[in-house]
Amino acid sequence: MKLLEGQIRIPSGCAIAAVISKDGNMMTGEKIVESMKPMHERSNGLGGGFAGYGIYPEYRDFYALHIFYDDNNCRTVCEQFLKDRFEIVKAENMPFRKVPEITDAPLMWRYFVATLSSLLSATQVDEKEYVARTVMKINTELKGTYVFSSGKNMGVFKAVGFPEDVGVFYRLDEYEGYSWTAHGRYPTNTPGWWGGAHPFSLL
C-alpha cells in the first residue's frame, strides 16, 4: 500500500547540530561546520546558518548587531538611526571569504553598541526590552535593512546556501566560542532569502 503525504509521520526534515562545552572551553567554528557535511541531503541550499556563543570576548558587554543592507543608502539611514539610539563602540564590514557556492550577498555590517542611560530612563524599559524594540523597529520600518543578530557576546551567521558553504563563507574557523548551533533549511513552500535562513535570534 502506497502511503500519501500526511499519512506517515516524518519527525524532522532539516539538518541541525550543536556543539557545547560544558566546561566553557573555547573551540573554533570548524567542528560545527564539519558536522553539517554528512547532513547535506537534509538541506536544499535555500538557507544555512550558525550561532556562536562566547565569540566576542573583547566586546562582551556590548550588543553585537549583525545587519544585512540592500545598498549603501540603506546603511546610511540605519546608521543614523543607530546613532540616535545607541553609543556605537565599533562599526565594521563583516569579514567573509568568497566561495562560488554563495552568491548575491547583501552588504553585511557589524556594530558593537551600548544603550544610553538617558534613553532607557525616558522610555522606562530595561536594557533588553529597549534593544528588542529597536531591532523590531528597524526590521519592520527601515526598508532594505535587516538585523539578523543582536545579542551580547554571540552572533548569528546565515545565508542562502548549504550550511557547510555558509560556514566557509563567514570564516567561522577564525572564531572561537564555547557553544555552537547550526541549521540547514529544507523549505518546501517558501523562497530562500538571506534574512529567512535559520537560526533566528533577537537577544
Label every PLM stretch briefly.
Residues 1-203:
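N-terminal segments that mediate ammonia production and transfer
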